[in-house]
């Protein structure tokens, strides 16, 4: 029995370490890359442009730089990816945002249906400079959550801010449950 435990216990620990490592990696691996091109699912609204940038990045050597004159939007139109994420209980959106100029205003993230309804949304406070992480579950977002037929994410420029830019990186619409620890901060109260 003692000899058997000597082999079984390390095997169990190795299995658990492998499983935990895979879950953690799946939760944080960026699904959308800005290394070689801007994915076709991104569409800039009027008064804005998007380009790849090596100026500020979190993963690899590039991020998505979005510059705008208000009002404007940046849309992500990948119905399939959004639906796969929304079907997972406890899933959500994860990204990093670099803000070069702090403003006392909120950027709105709206998950919209094909008819323009907004069952999920959140505001991200922009009174910071540098990088900030944004991890939020769909079920923690305000909204009526009545529809699961989300077809796009629309990011809207902050009200009262004439122009600006920000950098996005490590954008992921998780397809696994995010951890349950709620960590509100100044960006997402």
Predicted feature locations:
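Short beta-strand-plus-loop segments that form exposed binding edges in beta-rich domains
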Residues: 154-162
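Extracellular ligand-binding interfaces
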Residues: 68-144, 161-167, 172-177
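Short carbohydrate-recognition loop motifs
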Residues: 52-74
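Noncatalytic modules at the cell exterior or secretory-pathway interfaces
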Residues: 143-154
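Extracellular carbohydrate-recognition regions
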Residues: 25-47, 177-189
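N-terminal secretory signal peptides that target proteins for export/translocation
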Residues: 1-8
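Bacterial N-terminal signal peptides
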Residues: 9-21
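Short, surface-exposed loop/turn motifs at beta-strand boundaries within globular domains
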Residues: 27, 45, 57-59, 86-90, ...
């Amino acid at each position: 029995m003692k000899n058997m435990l000597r082999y079984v216990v390390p095997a169990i620990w190795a299995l658990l370490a492998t499983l935990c490592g895979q879950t953690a990696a799946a939760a944080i691996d960026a699904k959308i890359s800005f290394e070689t091109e801007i994915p076709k699912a991104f569409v800039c609204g009027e008064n804005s442009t998007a380009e790849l940038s090596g100026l500020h990045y979190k993963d690899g050597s590039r991020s998505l730089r979005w510059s705008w004159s208000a009002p404007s939007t940046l849309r992500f139109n990948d119905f399939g990816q959004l639906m796969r994420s929304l079907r997972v209980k406890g899933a959500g959106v994860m990204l990093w945002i670099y803000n070069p100029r702090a403003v006392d205003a909120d950027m709105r993230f709206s998950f919209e249906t094909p008819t323009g309804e907004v069952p999920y949304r959140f505001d991200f406070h922009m009174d910071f400079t540098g990088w900030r992480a944004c991890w939020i579950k769909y079920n923690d977002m305000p909204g009526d959550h009545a529809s699961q037929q989300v077809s796009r994410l629309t990011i809207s420029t902050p009200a009262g801010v004439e122009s600006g830019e920000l950098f996005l990186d490590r954008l992921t619409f998780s397809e696994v449950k995010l951890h349950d620890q709620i960590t509100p901060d100044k960006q997402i109260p």
